[in-house]
Amino acid sequence: MIDKRTMLAFVGGFAAIGAIAVALPHSVPAQAQGDARVASPTGEPVLIELFTSQGCSSCPPADKVAAKMAPSPGVVVISRPVTYWDRLGWKDTLAKEANTELQQAYARRGLSGQNGVYTPQAVVNGRFGTVGSRELEVRRGVAHNSGAGNAAIRVNDLGANGYGVGLGGDTAKTAELVLIGVTREVEVAIGSGENGGRTVTYTNALRDETRLASWNGGKASHVVTPAQLRVKGANRYALVLREPGGGPVLAARWLN
């Protein structure tokens, strides 16, 4: 049960996003390639999803790019290990079929940049795809493909009651709010396959994702309960507002 004082604090923080369409800044210059920080033109965090695999010899350089970019407050980086290279003999210990299905859905819808199902692939805001090891291209994707959703997520810590989540903005189609649990850093000793004998570190590796609510634009609120933050192996959580079926990402933000 959430007490009245806690809920009032949440509502007060949420009210600030009511005018999101006019409150967002128009532009922020992109950072230089060598700078570890990443800038979004709208000032809202940009989602970068890295489709990677322990069975892909081309993936470790992309995993390093993900680790380099992840600390920036301007992005939400999530590693999504896929299952389709398991057939080569080494079963990826982090792979999820849901990751493979999302990548396939992106390819069916069609991304700008380099579309298709391959690894390593970085997908920016569900709109732009490129080889995940090409850092400059990933950064260009952040600069050119953010803010198109005209939406925002705001979070208010409710202490023992979880987190209050406020949504604001517009959408042309019904979107869904998704809670994603990740492990900040996972070091894996790969026993065989193309990367056999190597130890690779994965950043913000997805453990589980749960659909919280649908959204049709305007102001909306939701509470993420403590029980929803008990995903096995997860020590960080992100919120993603996206059109379903491999549709574009409208907003993303770290919950904690």
PLM feature spans:
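Short loop/turn motifs enriched for small/polar and acidic residues
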Residues: 80-83, 125, 158
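Short, conserved sequence motifs used for protein processing/export or organelle targeting and
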Residues: 93-115, 127-256
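Active-site-proximal cofactor/substrate-binding loop regions of enzyme domains
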Residues: 2-111
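Ligand-binding face of N-terminal immunoglobulin V-set domains in extracellular IgSF glycoproteins
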Residues: 122
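Extracytoplasmic
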Residues: 43-45, 72-75, 117-119, 174, ...
